[in-house]
Amino acid sequence: MAKPAKRVAVTGAAGQIAYSLLFRIANGDLLGKDQPVILQLLDLPQAQAAVKGVVMELEDCAFPLLAGVVITDDPKVAFKDADVALLVGARPRSKGMERKDLLSANAEIFTVQGAALNEVASRDVKVLVVGNPANTNAYIAMKSAPDLPKKNFTAMLRLDHNRALSQLAAKTGKPVASIEKLAVWGNHSPTMYPDFRFATAEGESMLKLVNDDVWNRETFIPTVGKRGAAIIEARGLSSAASAANAAIDHVRDWVLGTNGKWVTMGIPSDGSYGIPEDIIYGVPVTCENGEYKRVEGLEIDAFSREKMDGTLAELLEERDGVAHLLKN
């Protein structure tokens, strides 16, 4: 007996990240190889023809799990009964644009999308914001959807998490899949703090394997933080395939579970680790039965506190920068 199809809404459907994302969702990488999906694709009116072209390609893959596709420029159509919403589309920063202008341009998009989710999405909708500034965009959407549980709104730090994993694997020679208990704290921006104090690889302490505090502070943390900029510099385009892969990882783990393994998600704070409530902040979590749970009680040393407070300061500044645009 086939499962009933799940509805997956994707915004920015004509964009580069979506182009790497949609085929994998239709292939079952997001929700499982036995779960049919209906894709509900949102983009601007001027991008509708491009979305139609992507849909033609999706059709030409003849994916057994793709049960239907909706193309629209109306958030209320895109988010209707959505089980998962991947908010990929955002206003990119153009040359000479101040950060506050970027924040207000995105606040406009995410208040509308949050309100539409509030009105028409499934009450259990799992929302992942990929479009930058992701944490604050997720905060805006959450605040614009008062009837949905706050825990439904998350921001993507999985790309930072995966970048940190690959740097640690390269440094230690350990297989990337063997590394456990890595955390990435804070904002999805160069201020985030990748933290391997608790990490292990094949049962060995990552701190002992690396044994190089200067590398941690001067190479590892900046490399992970500035990796996106390094890719733009090398390729002339932003990281789209790796971002799409991280989005798949984030939602798949949220839905299907992590078997006790730590992953990083940007989630609304409950006040723990000294982070004010509701701020969407990257923390280590485990997932089971479709729910995430923050890893509690980790010791925060002085260096970590400084890094965690630094990324928090940026998030508070962003929050205050959009406060006047939010109703509640």
UniProtKB/Swiss-Prot annotation:
Active-site residues, record numbering mapped to chain: 188 (proton acceptor)
Key words of the record: NAD, Oxidoreductase, Tricarboxylic acid cycle
Catalyzed reaction equations: (S)-malate + NAD(+) = oxaloacetate + NADH + H(+)
CDD domains, alphabetized: MDH_chloroplast-like
UniProt: substrate binding residues: 93, 99, 132, 163
Gene Ontology molecular functions: L-malate dehydrogenase (NAD+) activity
Origin superkingdom: Bacteria
Disulfide bonds: none
Chain positions recorded as NAD(+) binding sites: 12-18, 106, 113, 130-132
Family designation: Belongs to the LDH/MDH superfamily. MDH type 2 family.
Protein name, as recorded: Malate dehydrogenase 2
Organism (species): Burkholderia vietnamiensis (strain G4 / LMG 22486) (Burkholderia cepacia (strain R1808))
